[in-house]
Regions:
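Signature of Gram-negative chaperone-usher
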Residues: 1-128
Length: 128
């Protein structure tokens, strides 16, 4: 299981609202979210992100993005959420994979100017 932990973007007391449910980005509203997919040009002028590599294929049971973080052009952020898991019940290894995280940020015109930052920690907990 891989979890993401940390706060949403902040600049002093100003914040960008975390996306509590999986949804697409909407220009002009406060949103901060992430996913583990290769996103299309619906979110930017060029595709952003990547698929988990190598992918699970029903035989190797490698890790994969979890629900809420595995839909193209849809994003979510809740600290403590599991974003990826092998869920193979000990049926085999799931090593040597590359996970790429894509982030989205949208703000309204009324968002106070500033340098918005966050520190996110990804924790991988192995199970045997």
């Amino acid at each position: 299981m891989i979890t993401v932990n940390g706060p949403t973007l902040t600049s002093g007391s100003n914040t960008v609202t975390a996306m509590p449910a999986t949804t697409s980005g909407v220009h002009g509203i406060s949103q901060f979210g992430l996913n583990l997919k290769l996103n299309t040009t619906a979110t930017s002028t060029t595709p952003v992100g990547a698929e988990v590599s190598p992918a699970a294929n029903g035989t190797n049971y490698r890790g994969q993005a979890k629900a809420n973080y595995n839909t193209v052009d849809n994003f979510k952020f809740t600290t403590g959420d599991g974003v990826a898991d092998s869920a193979n019940g000990g049926a085999g290894g799931s090593d040597a994979q590359i996970f790429t995280v894509s982030y989205i940020v949208n703000v309204p015109g009324s968002q106070p100017a500033g340098t918005y930052t966050t520190t996110l920690t990804y924790i991988c907990t192995p199970t045997f």
